């Protein structure tokens, strides 16, 4: 009986020290959030537009980290899809869009604008400039075409317009493989 108390007395301090060490390590080396979701979120464009089907970029990043598709972000486009594929070691996929829509930007009819600033507050990328009770305008190069400024406008003076074709978003048609092969044969 005396040996049992001796064994308990010897093991109890060792167990308490080990438990305290594990408790300290759990607090000291705790990982905040999901590191993969944080890395994915850093690659997304942070427009918070909801075009991916999620209420913002962070929920979409968490969904990607949980296994959702990486090709649902129209503002990020192909460059974001390639970066996400490299990060997650996946194959890049084409952008998942219901139909290919031309790029659009918001346009404010300044004569109708009352300067309420609701569109400025709604814009996730600060592409709208103006001041209270003064007309507002859109910086077209900054606008992602997310449509978030349309809803809060009380006088409906904002519309989405297609951007004119220029070198920034011009798409050349892909050559057909047959044409390329025939050109090689003629050159040889």
Curated annotation (Swiss-Prot):
Residues 32-90 form the 4Fe-4S domain. GO terms for biological process: electron transport chain. SUPFAM superfamilies: 4Fe-4S ferredoxins (SSF54862). Pfam families: Fer4_21, FeS. It is found in: Cell inner membrane. Its EC number is 7.-.-.-. InterPro entries: 4Fe-4S_dom (IPR007202), 4Fe4S_Fe-S-bd (IPR017896), 4Fe4S_Fe_S_CS (IPR017900), Elect_transpt_cplx_RnfB/RsxB (IPR010207), RnfB/RsxB_Proteobac (IPR016463), RnfB_subfamily (IPR050294). The keyword Transferase does not apply. PROSITE patterns: 4FE4S (PS51656), 4FE4S_FER_1 (PS00198), 4FE4S_FER_2 (PS51379). GO terms for molecular function: 4 iron, 4 sulfur cluster binding; electron transfer activity; metal ion binding. [4Fe-4S] cluster 2 binds at residues 113, 116, 119, 153. Residues 1-26 are annotated as: Hydrophobic. The complex is composed of six subunits: RnfA, RnfB, RnfC, RnfD, RnfE and RnfG. This is Ion-translocating oxidoreductase complex subunit B. It comes from Pseudomonas aeruginosa (strain UCBPP-PA14). The gene is rnfB.
């Amino acid at each position: 009986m005396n040996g049992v108390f001796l064994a308990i007395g010897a093991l109890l301090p060792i167990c308490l020290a080990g438990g305290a060490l594990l408790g300290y390590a759990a607090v000291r080396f705790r990982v905040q959030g999901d590191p993969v979701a944080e890395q994915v979120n850093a690659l997304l464009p942070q427009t918070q537009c909801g075009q991916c089907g999620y209420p913002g970029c962070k929920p979409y990043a968490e969904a990607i980290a949980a296994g959702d598709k990486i090709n649902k972000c129209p503002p990020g486009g192909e460059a974001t899809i390639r970066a996400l594929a490299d990060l997650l070691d996946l194959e890049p996929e084409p952008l998942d869009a219901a139909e290919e829509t031309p790029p659009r930007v918001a346009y404010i009819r300044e004569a109708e604008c009352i300067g309420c600033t609701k569109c400025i507050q709604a814009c996730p990328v600060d592409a709208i400039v103006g001041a209270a009770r003064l007309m507002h305008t859109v910086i077209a190069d900054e606008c992602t075409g997310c449509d978030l400024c349309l809803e809060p406008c009380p006088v409906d003076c904002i519309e989405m317009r297609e951007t004119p074709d220029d070198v920034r978003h011009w798409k050349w048609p892909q050559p057909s493989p047959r044409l390329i092969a025939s050109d090689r044969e003629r050159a040889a």
